[in-house]
Amino acid sequence: MKLRGRKVVGGKAEGELIVSKKPLSFLGGVDPETGIVTDAESDIRGQSIAGKILAFPRGKGSTVGSYVIYALKKNGKAPKAIIVGEAETIVATGAIIAGIPMVQGIDVSKLKTGQRVRINADEGEVEVLDG
């Protein structure tokens, strides 16, 4: 299955998906030292986003969340790429400063944790490789 969205940050990545059906706050919601989701309201609480393709509907919370994304990258705990339904300023800025490929305009309800995907953010494409 191929899904088409729009580029926020260019680049390519392939890997395992971790999908949240809820908006995600990076400040106080993701530990920048470990990449573990700590937000008590998150449906992926306790799971690591490190080295995975992270998909969620949109970001929420403080603008400091952008710097949490940057810290995740500097600590080697960032996702390989980000897929969102709606790219709001916090997550988009974080992906830009961290150099993480990002695509917006994707219906994340069509994606499942554990699937393998290939992202060509330059073209706004997300391809599900299995399941």
Curated annotation (Swiss-Prot):
One function term, GO molecular function aspect: hydro-lyase activity
Enzyme Commission (EC) number: 4.2.1.182
Class of this enzyme: lyase
Isomerase listed as a keyword: no
One Pfam entry name: AcnX_swivel_put
Residues at the active site: S62 (proton acceptor)
GO BP term (any one): isopentenyl diphosphate biosynthetic process, mevalonate pathway
Key words, A-Z: Isoprene biosynthesis, Lyase
Known pathway: Isoprenoid biosynthesis; isopentenyl diphosphate biosynthesis via mevalonate pathway
NCBIfam families in the record: PRK03955.1
Function per UniProt: Component of a hydro-lyase that catalyzes the dehydration of mevalonate 5-phosphate (MVA5P) to form trans-anhydromevalonate 5-phosphate (tAHMP). Involved in the archaeal mevalonate (MVA) pathway, which provides fundamental precursors for isoprenoid biosynthesis, such as isopentenyl diphosphate (IPP) and dimethylallyl diphosphate (DMAPP).
Oligomer status and interactors: Heterodimer composed of a large subunit (PMDh-L) and a small subunit (PMDh-S).
Family to which the UniProt record says this protein belongs: Belongs to the AcnX type II small subunit family.
Name recorded for this polypeptide: Phosphomevalonate dehydratase small subunit
Organism of provenance: Thermococcus gammatolerans (strain DSM 15229 / JCM 11827 / EJ3)
Lineage summary: Archaea, Methanobacteriati, Methanobacteriota, Thermococci, Thermococcales
